[in-house]
Regions:
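Intrinsically disordered, low-complexity Pro/Gly/Ser/Thr-rich segments with frequent PxxP/GP/PP motifs
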Residues: 369-408, 468-493
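Active-site neighborhood of glycoside hydrolase catalytic domains
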Residues: 58, 74-164, 306-307, 311
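Substrate-binding clefts and catalytic carboxylate motifs of secreted carbohydrate-active enzymes
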Residues: 104, 140-143, 152-362
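Buried hydrophobic-core signal for structured, non-transmembrane domains
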Residues: 350-356, 412, 448-454
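Short acidic, flexible loop segments centered on an aromatic residue
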Residues: 358-376, 455-471
Length: 505
């Protein structure tokens, strides 16, 4: 069976009259652009209009459909029961014919909160009412009106009955120790969930999107009144700063801070998705929170309110690719090394993995190289292998005991039918400690392509135009002192700007 790789769709706008088939199509096209094969309609919003499902049918996007209940408990009075029964019947009958409809889900996070008996639960009857709504009324209606479609009682859930709904070994899991729990990105590697249906990390939207709600220079600060009003999780701008100080040097300008925040988000989700794809079979779903925004805000989305793509969305295009190479490196980040301890020693190694989410076996070549900051090759390796359909395959560990963690990095690439189809780089130290050389980035436009050149290792190269609405075949990519041709999908190619992690200083 196919691994589910997707994220969650929330209402497209706080003013619903602005939403129409054109806006929905543009958003779902962005989902397909990033190689999604499914999408979750989150239960804290509303049931989308028919055109949403028509477009998903057309695009081949499987829909996980929540019923519209989330993060609350309800008193099941006779009047309320009659109301919701009609709601369930009408929506099941309205949507059941869609080829894209893959699953009905009772609610978002309610079983978990009832199980934990948290402060939202005020009286015992609410537990009884929960069972009646989500384990009797809804499944009976789904069985009667849409018996072909699977019903799942809640997300997360282990199958219902308040049986440890967030159990990592059963059902689906919402995992937030990274972000809410302030754990490092490498924490994902400690877990082997069966289906991770929600996890996320915040980032600022594009500067041009921020300028839609303020053009006052004094507001261009993560802790200004305006920025904190456009942040709906209390103190989360400080949380972004906390992760940033662990990872990067202090940005010298607000636009550089925005860029760094987007790289944090992109790398945080990448760590998770790549780990779970490497463990395909044990884990069959990686669903990050969230696709879109309903207003211009600092949030978990990969597409901001104005439709601009954050770095995460380009990363998603790569880590959701049907054929993908990834690297499980061991170094300073994975060991959580404390440089002030007497024994500041840790393993320096890589384990490469190829994930094949296609229906055919793939004959591929894997190449890796240990390089210095100028991208000169110090050591290299190559291996040919066949990766069976719908599997992931590990390569042997390679150790680098003599590597300089501050000056050496590893590049890797996956070649299929003579073309590089997936690639990346890893460091053994935090980016803030790596001795990047100035890559002296340049670019030129040739027809519908931008050719980007670097004279040294360039990490997470960003290409922006003046309006920051340029959509490219690839962006926020790594260069090994070489050049890359990037196809322009839309947007002006005048007044292009380039930067990389070297510029976070």
């Amino acid at each position: 069976s196919e691994m589910c790789i997707r994220d969650s769709y929330i209402p497209e706008d706080n003013l619903l009259g602005r939403v129409n088939p054109e806006t929905t199509r543009k958003l779902l096209e962005k989902a397909k652009f990033a190689n999604y094969n499914a999408i979750r309609v989150w239960g804290g919003g509303y049931y989308p209009s028919d055109w949403f499902y028509d477009i998903c049918d057309e695009m081949g996007l499987m829909v996980w459909q929540d019923f519209m209940f989330a993060c609350a408990v309800y008193e099941l009075t006779p009047e309320f029961e009659a109301n919701i029964r009609q709601e369930f019947i009408e929506n099941v009958k309205r949507l059941r014919h869609h080829a894209s409809l893959g699953l009905w889900c009772g609610n978002n996070e309610m079983e978990q909160f009832v199980f934990e008996r948290n402060s939202w639960l005020t009286k015992p009857s609410e537990v009884k009412d929960y069972f009646l709504m989500f384990e009797r009324i809804i499944p009976e209606i789904v069985h009667e009106y849409d018996p072909q479609t699977f019903y799942w009682p809640a997300s997360p859930s282990s199958g219902g009955c308040l049986d440890e709904p967030n159990d990592p070994n059963r059902g689906d899991v919402h995992y937030w120790k990274v972000w809410h729990g302030n754990r490092p990105f490498t924490e994902y590697r400690k877990y082997f969930f069966r289906y991770l249906s929600e996890f996320g990390f915040q980032a600022f939207p594009s500067v041009k999107t921020i300028e839609q709600f303020t053009d006052n220079e004094e507001d261009m600060n993560p802790f200004s009144y305006i920025m904190e009003k456009h942040q709906r999780q209390y103190s989360a701008n400080g949380k972004i700063m906390g992760y940033m100080q662990q990872t990067y040097k202090y940005p010298n300008s607000f636009p550089t801070f925005v860029y760094a925040s987007q790289l944090l988000q992109a790398d945080g989700i990448r760590y998770g998705v790549e780990h779970f794809r490497r463990n395909r079979g044990r884990c069959m779903g990686a669903v990050y929170w969230q696709l879109n925004d309903c207003w211009p805000v600092i949030s978990w989305s990969s597409v901001d309110y104005c439709g601009r793509l954050k770095a995460l969305h380009y990363y998603a295009k790569r880590f959701f690719a049907p054929l993908m190479i990834s690297c499980e490196e061991q170094g300073m980040m994975s060991s959580e090394a404390n440089m002030n301890r007497e024994h500041f020693v840790f393993e320096k190694s890589i384990r490469l993995n190829v994930a094949n989410e296609t229906m055919q076996d793939q004959n591929v070549t894997v190449r890796w190289a240990l390089r210095d900051p100028g991208a000169a090759v110090l050591e290299s390796g190559e291996q040919e292998l066949t990766v069976p359909a719908l599997t992931s395959t590990w390569l042997d560990k390679v150790e680098f005991p003599d590597a300089d963690i501050f000056s050496h990095y590893v590049s890797y690439e996956l070649i299929c039918d003579g073309k590089v189809v997936s690639e990346g780089t890893v460091n053994f130290s935090y980016p803030k400690y790596f001795r990047y050389e100035d890559p002296e980035l340049t670019c030129r436009v040739e027809g519908d392509e931008i050719v980007v050149s670097a004279k040294a290792y360039a990490k997470s190269v960003e290409i922006l135009n003046e309006n920051e609405d340029l959509v490219l075949e690839d962006n926020y990519f790594d260069l090994n002192a070489n050049e890359k041709r990037v196809k322009v999908i839309s947007g002006s190619t005048e007044n292009l700007r380039l930067r990389s992690v070297y510029d976070i200083r």
